[in-house]
């Protein structure tokens, strides 16, 4: 009977990606299969996020639920990873001594050694170091789970925005070698993946090395990914306006695989607040980048993030944010009331805005964003949209569901063989959280672009032998 692994994941898409890699890694080295419930597991991992308020207390609350499982099964191993573990490792050891393994986002690749050592010595382990690119060298081969996949191309952030904890929990920017990224995507394409979402805390700051030492910038990487046959959609998240350079804008003119949707967080429309946030750009510079992008790709849909109630935010600052929203006309966006993150510069600023004011501003801002979002959805009525079919609809299993380029969910009547393929539909109804469509054509009638077959990329380097833990390292091209 195989050993069971249960992973609970909180936070961003990068954490989701990391959890997938943990499961693949521990399956390849120790034979762990994923359990649906913590009660059935031999190893429980909590992958944490420190972005939201009271993140630490949320962790201890969850660990308290698992404490009895450990008491009833002394052989059960419990590990805590992610950004809270990186930030609060010693506190976790002190308040939850029954936790066996504490690891950071950059040391998840060492999980097999940690599991071995804890099993042998019965002594807890803590490793929240920042060993840079080593993490990616030790990952198991990717396994596709559907037609869309996440691929991490870099880690960390070097922008040090005053409100953000990421540089302190995930470290500064480290880019994967470009050949490793392309090889992983080719492996996924071989398994039927049609859409990749390139991940990074500051993804458009990517500076990965080729095997010959030459540096590949993000725009060049987009061209290389688009050339892989089978990859017909490229998304990426999360971007920073400062790193959104002209060559990336130009890529939207020449790469049809790049979806007509961009998430570009701005946080505020006030130059004064942007300066206090240490964002490195003005509202006008942000608008200028969007104008250039819409000139390159007129139908592009924009989304963003907004922080409300940052320390010192005046009525005028808030109105500047509302004006920016009005001028950009976002397709959809995310907004949050500011909460101080321990250890960040902004945490030392006085919280001089009442909760009532914060909530009122958030309500007004979300009302405007929702109005814009619904207006965009209504404009899609009776239009033809290409969607990637991801599976049966959650609300009606007799229907299929997929996403448009601008990330809208569409449900329609179709056949099971369409799952994992593209179809064109006519939008027939606009609902609050989704769209309905009517099938127009299937993928066989589309004539999608064909370029470099994945097997050609995979043949460029043969996999090395598994290491002592059974991990096959990513092959590198020889010069």
From Swiss-Prot:
Domain named TRAM is located at 378-441
Q: Which residues bind [4Fe-4S] cluster 2?
A: 157, 161, 164
Q: Which SMART domains match?
A: Elp3
Residue numbers binding [4Fe-4S] cluster 1: 12, 49, 83
Q: Which GO terms describe its cellular component?
A: cytosol
Look up the record and name the cofactor or cofactors this protein needs. Answer: [4Fe-4S] cluster
Q: Which PROSITE patterns has this protein been placed in? A: MTTASE_N, MTTASE_RADICAL, RADICAL_SAM, TRAM
Q: Span of the secretion signal?
A: none
Citing just one GO molecular function, the answer is: metal ion binding
- In the Enzyme Commission scheme, what number(s) does this protein have? 2.8.4.3
* Subcellular location(s) per record: Cytoplasm
Q: Which reaction does it catalyse?
A: N(6)-dimethylallyladenosine(37) in tRNA + (sulfur carrier)-SH + AH2 + 2 S-adenosyl-L-methionine = 2-methylsulfanyl-N(6)-dimethylallyladenosine(37) in tRNA + (sulfur carrier)-H + 5'-deoxyadenosine + L-methionine + A + S-adenosyl-L-homocysteine + 2 H(+)
MTTase N-terminal domain residues are 3-120
Primary site of residence: cytoplasm
**Physiological role:** Catalyzes the methylthiolation of N6-(dimethylallyl)adenosine (i(6)A), leading to the formation of 2-methylthio-N6-(dimethylallyl)adenosine (ms(2)i(6)A) at position 37 in tRNAs that read codons beginning with uridine.
What binding partners and quaternary form does the record give?
Monomer.
- Tell me the protein family, please: Belongs to the methylthiotransferase family. MiaB subfamily.
Name-wise, this protein is: tRNA-2-methylthio-N(6)-dimethylallyladenosine synthase
Q: Which organism is it from?
A: Idiomarina loihiensis (strain ATCC BAA-735 / DSM 15497 / L2-TR)
Organismal lineage: Bacteria, Pseudomonadati, Pseudomonadota, Gammaproteobacteria, Alteromonadales
